[in-house]
């Protein structure tokens, strides 16, 4: 018999954020670390390109704000989803409390990223 009223799951939302965060972390974070953590300190890129005025101008632009928020928020959603399911795999059955704690942490970091970007 087919259940005509199946229970809706919220899991596709979390898996979507998990996938987006994993993709962002794998594709864009290494480039960001290369540029900001290696090329600028070694002098390969001009330090004036990373002056406060230029960075502030980038972060306060629409594309820069989206990039900064996504760089902070998406990997956090990925990490918290992985932590939530990792606890389950390790037999730490925290239930709804663990789910709320993990995703609330990711939401808090996302909200703080948005707030801090608009404070600049």
UniProtKB/Swiss-Prot annotation:
GO terms for biological process: fumarate metabolic process. It is a multi-pass membrane protein. It is found in: Cell inner membrane. Keywords: Cell inner membrane, Cell membrane, Membrane, Transmembrane, Transmembrane helix. The chain crosses the membrane at residues 25-45, 57-77, 100-120. GO terms for molecular function: succinate dehydrogenase activity. It comes from the Bacteria. Pfam families: Fumarate_red_D. The keyword Cytoplasm does not apply. One of its GO terms (cellular component) is fumarate reductase complex. Anchors the catalytic components of the fumarate reductase complex to the cell membrane, binds quinones. Belongs to the FrdD family. This is Fumarate reductase subunit D. It comes from Photobacterium profundum (strain SS9). The lineage of its organism: Bacteria, Pseudomonadati, Pseudomonadota, Gammaproteobacteria, Vibrionales.
């Amino acid at each position: 018999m087919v259940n005509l009223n199946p229970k809706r799951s919220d899991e596709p939302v979390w898996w979507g954020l998990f996938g987006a965060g994993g993709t962002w972390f794998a594709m864009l974070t290494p480039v960001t670390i290369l540029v900001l953590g290696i090329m600028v300190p070694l002098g390969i890129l001009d330090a004036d390109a990373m002056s406060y005025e230029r960075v502030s101008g980038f972060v306060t632009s629409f594309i820069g704000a989206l990039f900064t928020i996504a760089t902070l928020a998406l990997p956090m959603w990925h990490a918290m989803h992985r932590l939530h399911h990792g606890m389950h795999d390790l037999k730490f059955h925290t239930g709804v409390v663990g789910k709320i704690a993990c995703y609330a942490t990711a939401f808090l970091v996302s909200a703080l990223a948005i707030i801090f970007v608009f404070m600049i």
